Amino acid sequence: MEVYLSEHIAPSAYARLARHFEIVDNFDHPERLAAMVIRRAVVPRAVIAHAPNLKVIAMHGVSRDTIDTAAAAEFGVPVSNVPGLGAPAVAELAVADLLALNRQLKFVNNGLCAGRFDHFGAEEFVCHEMTGRTLGLVGTGNIAHRVADILRAAFDVRVLCWNPRRTAAECAAWGYEQVETLQELFRRSDFVNVSITLCDATRGLINAPVFAAANPELLLVNTSRGGIVNEHDLYVALTTGQIRAAASDVFEHEPPASDDPLIHLDNFIATFHIGGSTYESLERVSNRAVDYVFQYTGVAER
């Protein structure tokens, strides 16, 4: 039996698969596939429809947005995911981004590389401390909770949240104040963390009307999925002073073009989808995904 593996996984998980399956990196013979382990690869209907022996598509993470889930359901192929196991790593990146944005580290580094060393008393390098500020959460899943916990413990931040699927009482139980609109969240927050799933309802969710209402000192971090934040509108917001700075680990089209003006802004930090890239996260997530391969194929590990 063959298992399609789209990208690198933890060596321990790879070894488990290799002992029992032939591992392939292409869809040349979908009829031979018993399972797939997917990180970011696209799995279209055409592949699923021609894979009669496929028992499971095991996501190496949470989001299923690269999978034709309707086709998977039609052909009776479960799509598993691993919520929560990558949250510590992604939350650490989100917090690191906020710290770097607040201290303008990209701007300062670029200035130093250009020969500047005139920071003493220079107004453009002065910022507010993070203690006692307000964090806004777009989404209230595992990553959002982890970000809030870290920032509350370290900086005693107040937390607002936007999640129409939750009640005010549920948010209050977490110690958050629920707001009704994204515009209100962006207006009242000093920092906003985006941690929601990409779907039709969230595509382009954060856009020009939201930025128009924002606190001009706002720092925005997106470690969830590209497409949730409208990148053109974000560029306008960053270059016209609607918000102060932003960071993103994800893009609508990955990789973004090397000449994309957004990624070259001094007040924008871009990373290439590294949120889950810690040894610990990789170990947890990879092995849980492989657990599902064995579970659904019925192969007994030895």
State each model region's role.
Residues T140-G141:
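Glycine-rich Rossmann-fold phosphate-binding loop(s) that bind the pyrophosphate
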Residues A154-A172:
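NAD(P)-binding Rossmann-fold cofactor-contacting core
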Residues M1-S80, N207:
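An N-terminal-biased, well-structured beta-alpha scaffold segment characteristic
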Residues F75, P83-T134, R146-A154:
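Phosphate-binding beta-alpha-beta segment of Rossmann-like dinucleotide-binding domains, i.e.
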Residues R45-I48, R166-P261:
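Rossmann-like adenosine-cofactor binding region
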Residues R39, H60, D97, V194-L198, ...:
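Short, well-ordered coil/turn residues at beta-beta hairpins
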Residues E7, C161-R165, S224:
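N-terminal Rossmann-fold cofactor-binding loop
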Residues A73, S80-L93, L101, F107, ...:
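C-terminal helix-to-coil terminal segments
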